[in-house]
Regions:
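Conserved Nudix-box catalytic region and its N-terminal flanking loop in Nudix hydrolases
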Residues: 17-60, 164
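Charged phosphate-binding loop/patch that engages nucleotide di/tri-phosphates or the phosphate backbone
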Residues: 122-164
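Conserved N-terminal beta-strand and adjoining loop/helix that marks the start
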Residues: 1-22
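Short, P/G- and charge-enriched loop/turn segments at secondary-structure junctions
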Residues: 1-3, 70, 103-108
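Active-site-adjacent beta-strand/loop module that shapes the phosphate/pyrophosphate-binding cleft
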Residues: 73-106, 118-123, 136-147
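A short coil-to-beta-strand element that immediately follows conserved catalytic motifs
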Residues: 61-71
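Short hydrophobic/aromatic beta-strand or adjacent loop that forms the aromatic wall/cage
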Residues: 8-12, 79-83, 114
Length: 164
């Protein structure tokens, strides 16, 4: 007898800026950084879940029409990712706050899922993220290509008119 056990779906947003940086969230109590992402609730679309999770984990309120659908990616044995992307101007991260909490099994306290935020160069993903996330962000998604596609210009490009 076999049981079909579908993989859970986690939805999130890859937030880029034109300085070739990616917004990452530090996972509380862990050594790694991650994208704002999380599980899809019953009745939600992947886009709805990505917007909600980004808001809960960072406080950012993104507009649906600002997101580009990157698609679904194999992630772990139990989970797939559905990711979207957007480009934003680089902004001060001091105002970001994680509203999503979990019960810490050691202290018994409610802690934020994310306890820090940072803009990081694309090349730093492997040093900061888990190997599975590094595979997605480093091999399956071309961050440079996404940036060019969303902005219409290469990273760091300054038009002659803007330079004058």
């Amino acid at each position: 007898m076999s049981f079909f056990n579908p993989k859970r779906l986690s939805c999130g947003v890859v937030i880029l800026n034109q300085d070739r940086e990616l917004l990452l969230c530090h996972v509380t109590g862990q050594n790694h950084w991650d994208l704002p992402k999380g599980g899809i609730d019953p009745g939600e679309t992947p886009l709805d879940a990505a917007l909600r999770e980004t808001r809960e984990e960072s406080g950012l309120r993104l507009q649906p029409d600002a997101l580009f659908d990157l698609g679904r990616f194999a992630y772990t044995n139990k989970k797939n990712l559905h990711l979207f992307a957007t480009v934003m101007p680089r902004f001060d991260l001091k105002e970001l706050r994680c509203e999503s909490r979990y019960l810490d099994r050691y202290s018994g306290r409610q802690l934020p899922e994310m306890d820090g935020f940072g803009w990081f160069a694309f090349e730093r993903v492997a040093a900061l993220c888990t190997p599975k996330m590094t595979t997605v962000l480093g091999s399956r998604i071309d961050l440079e290509g996404v940036l060019v596609q969303l902005t219409g210009a290469p990273a760091g490009f300054v038009s002659a008119a803007a330079a004058a």
